[in-house]
Amino acid sequence: MKYADRYGNRWEETGLQDRFLEKLYKSVPGRAVVKVLVHPWVSRMGGWILSQKASCWLIPLFLKGHPMDESGWVKQRFTSYNDFFMRKLKPGQRPVEEDTARIISPCDAKLTVCPITEYGIMKIKHTPYTVKELLKSEKLARAYEGGYGFVYRLTVDDYHRYIYTETGKKSGNYKIPGIFHTVNPIANDLEPIYKENTREFCLIRTTDAGTVLQMEVGALMVGKIEKDQEEAFVHRGEEKGRFAFGGSTIVVLYQRGQVQPDQDLLDNSRDGYETKVTQGEAVGDKVGKCRK
């Protein structure tokens, strides 16, 4: 995997999970196993198991491999592995950028910024997708031609609660049923995961950034995506939902002429590097708005 930070550093790392997925997706026996694993019932079963009290023994094993500062958590005792995975942080642990002329990240993640062509095509890690395939709506897809797609990939070590990126009137949620591939880039090289995986999105009609589309993409072993369902007026930085165990992705689409991504994010994405960002961090400017 190729990663970058906001300080100009770039590096590559391959973890145990990456090596396992590479063998799984790139071998004949592995592909046969994948065909079973991606079915929704497998993720539902996994989610149920990890929501049981008996799963708590997995927590210290996870922390051994992924050391964390526990002082920022609201609680230190958990009723299940999923309860731990969806843990809440204390106020102030993820400050939201105060300058509303800047756009923000909805979550802790590895970010790829994808320009959307005038034909509605965006490349995610060198794999071309059309916005129409992503949304299953040609009419809605046309509204984002020439804009930008921000693809936030969460891994198991990320904070799995996420927020609204903008203030505005939110639509109801639209669900697109599908299967549950892992969102690891290794799978994306071989499978069109962002047009096959289960996903849900809403529209946020804002006064200064057009109509923003915010989508949650389910993934292998994500038992559920917990979120609100109703139409409402929402506020930037307000909690929108949380993912149960597993890697997941949030996709945010902006219309043409509404935002300008930060240059380091564009450069990293062009060169195939995902940039590590945190929830509430500024990732670009609203066009025509002056920074404070």
Model region roles, listed by residue range:
Residues M1-K292:
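Contiguous, well-folded functional domains in the mature portion of proteins
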